[in-house]
C-alpha cells in the first residue's frame, strides 16, 4: 500500500534489482478508506517536504488512532496543498485515542 509517488519509487528500485513484477502494489488515495480485517484506515493528506504525504486514521474496535511520521501546518505550501485540517478536526471531534 502506498501513494502514487511511493509506489513509483519502490517500483523503480525493484526494477533496478531485477525484482519487478514480484510485488503487488495497492495505490492509496487521501479520503479513500481501506478495510483491513477489523480495521478501517483512512489516508489523510498532510503537508510535508516530501510530496504526496499522508497520515492515517486507523479505526479499530477499541477506538481511533491517528498515525503520521510528522506533520506541519503550512497555510501557503509551495506544492501539494495544505494539510487536510477539516478531516483531522472531524476525527478530533469524534475522539482519538492517540496521535
Task: Specify the residue positions occupied by each region the protein language model found.
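His/Asp/Glu-rich metal-coordinating catalytic cores
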Residues: 1-99
Amino acid at each position: 500500500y502506498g501513494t502514487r509517488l511511493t509506489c513509483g519509487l519502490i517500483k523503480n528500485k525493484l526494477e533496478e534489482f531485477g525484482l519487478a513484477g514480484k510485488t503487488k502494489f495497492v495505490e492509496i488515495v487521501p479520503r479513500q478508506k481501506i478495510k483491513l480485517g477489523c480495521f478501517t484506515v483512512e489516508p489523510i493528506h498532510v503537508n510535508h517536504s516530501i510530496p504526496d504525504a499522508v497520515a492515517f486514521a486507523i479505526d479499530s474496535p477499541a477506538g481511533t488512532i491517528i498515525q503520521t511520521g510528522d506533520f506541519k501546518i503550512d497555510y501557503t505550501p509551495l506544492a501539494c496543498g495544505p494539510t487536510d485540517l477539516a478531516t483531522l478536526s472531524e476525527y478530533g471531534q469524534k475522539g482519538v485515542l492517540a496521535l
